[in-house]
Amino acid sequence: MARTDNDTWDLASSVGATATMVAAARAVATRAPRPVIDDPFAAPLVQAVGVDFFTRLATGELTTEELDTNDAESPVGMSRFADAMAARTRFFDDFFAEAMRAGPPPIRQGVILASGLDARAYRLSWPQDMVLFEIDQPEVLTFKAATLADLGVRPSTKLATVAVDLRNDWPAALAEAGFDASAPTAWIAEGLLGYLPPDAQDRLLDTIGELSAPGSRLAVESVPTHHEADQEELREKMKESSDRWRSHGFDVDFSELVFLGERADVTDYLRDRGWTVDATPTNQLLTRYGLAPLDSDEGFAEVVYVSATR
């Protein structure tokens, strides 16, 4: 189903299903012979969502080799998708670790925008006086907290969940949860911008800037602009990937979930607004973590990972 202005979702449908798919990819990456990441909560969270395709992928019952058979024409196979998600996850893990070592003044509050099934509040080590804010739709946050509690898992830091849609007044909800705009903050927007219209991307970055005291840091995954002439071809490629996995029970059409079109280059946008910016292309990130680079025409090859300091 195509996106609408006020659409909602759970972790088994629409944009929420992509969060579950990414968690399944993290489970695949965690089982790798030489894992780049270690996310012990990815598989149980996916299993709790209860979508058969994702469950079988997360537990290893369905292998990436099975999904990638005869998949040479696909924009990206499942094994490369898992590699890309492993590198992406590690980038944001490393960002938080580096941010916690920054200062003075030290950064002791972090914000995860559209956190989905992100379990960093549970699986990473944090300073004793750290507070982490997770923002997402109420149903997503409630499900994740309840599932991890049932597993007997407790957060490794002070965790404040902020149940609000990013299309609503999330800064007010964040402040009500205890966020201190006068203190430096580490922000991450992982796997988010492609699901925002271009103008909403700009508003989000502007709002983050307004809430960021000196010394704050931001990490974001920047998606490329897509000119009108290229949009139909890209949507068709995304649909082909979805269709190839459909015989295994996959029921998500990526082409209906993302917003294409021309959008601001995040690196330039932040730099023009006073941030000091560093940009890392996907293939450079893959190489850094010992993973094979993507071909130029594979999905995610054009994504750039941006870290910025206020």
From Swiss-Prot:
Enzyme Commission identifier(s): 2.1.1.-
Pfam families given in the database record: LCM
Superkingdom of origin organism: Bacteria
GO MF term set: methyltransferase activity
GO BP terms: methylation
Residues binding S-adenosyl-L-methionine, per UniProt: D136, D165, L166
Keywords tagged on the record: Methyltransferase, S-adenosyl-L-methionine, Transferase
This protein's record includes keyword DNA repair: no
Family affiliation: Belongs to the UPF0677 family.
Function: Exhibits S-adenosyl-L-methionine-dependent methyltransferase activity.
Record-given protein name: Putative S-adenosyl-L-methionine-dependent methyltransferase Mvan_1346
